[in-house]
A protein has these predicted regions:
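Structural alpha/beta core scaffold segments of enzyme domains
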Residues: 1-230
Length: 230
């Protein structure tokens, strides 16, 4: 069977929008900054904020505070840099909270991925080969697009045994909104395509879809898609 599958760009819609509080202390060479971040990566936040301010990393502390979910949407920097720079220059605590509209516009979305898939099985319904070419729209900036497409490539074989695999996934930059981390991290889009062709093959082979999957599912000791042993 041969088919093209396409997924859409999706918004995380986490409960609370991005919010940051930055509090400066001291003066001159002793000046430091404590940032309360609702993000997902305190070390990356610290490093990026220090670079924005042009100071040593040791002068910036980032503390993660509880938030109403993120699902990958707060993995990239959002308003941490804005709050930090304003607090540093003004010498006063600064809090920056995005509106829902600002949040929608600013943070990365789930990657739309187009997957051209060719797959086959023998007359008994045993999977033979899988050929996939996937392109992910990462938008104008890279974010973690390369890793998302790497994960998509690793998961597109699904939990099945294939006699032959030929898989290539590419993250491309476009003039569309930026895409990055989203729960599943590329595996969701890949599995949508995989399970689609499994259904098509089962129908052509005249085998119940559940039985077809049971016949081909990996078991302990099998080597599957990414080369890992189950």
């Amino acid at each position: 069977v041969s088919e093209t599958f396409a997924t859409q760009r999706i918004e995380h819609a986490f409960l609370d929008p991005e919010s940051t509080l930055a509090v400066p202390s001291g003066d001159g060479e002793q000046k430091t900054l404590h940032v309360y971040s609702g993000g997902q990566g305190v070390w990356d936040d610290r490093n990026d904020i220090a670079a924005i301010l042009g100071v040593e990393r040791e002068r910036v502390t980032v503390e993660l505070v509880s938030n109403g979910g993120a699902f990958g949407g707060k993995e990239d920097m959002s308003n941490q840099g804005h709050a930090a720079l304003a607090a540093w220059l003004l010498g006063h605590p600064v809090k920056c909270t995005l509106s829902r509209v600002e949040s929608f516009r600013m943070h990365a979305k789930r990657h739309p991925i187009t997957l051209d898939v060719r797959a086959g099985c023998d007359a008994d319904g045993v999977l033979t080969g899988l050929h996939v070419r996937a392109i992910g729209d990462s938008g104008a900036y890279a974010s973690v697009g390369m890793k998302v497409l790497e994960r998509a490539a690793g998961h597109v074989a699904g939990p099945y045994r294939w006699q032959s695999l030929d898989i290539k996934a590419t993250a491309v930059r476009t003039n569309n909104p930026i895409c990055g981390a989203f729960r599943g991290f590329g595996a969701n889009q890949a599995q949508f395509a995989t399970e689609g062709v499994i259904d098509r093959l089962a129908e052509l082979a005249g085998i119940d879809p559940w039985e077809f999957r049971s016949k081909n599912v990996i078991t302990p000791g099998d080597t599957w898609g990414p080369g890992q042993v189950m």
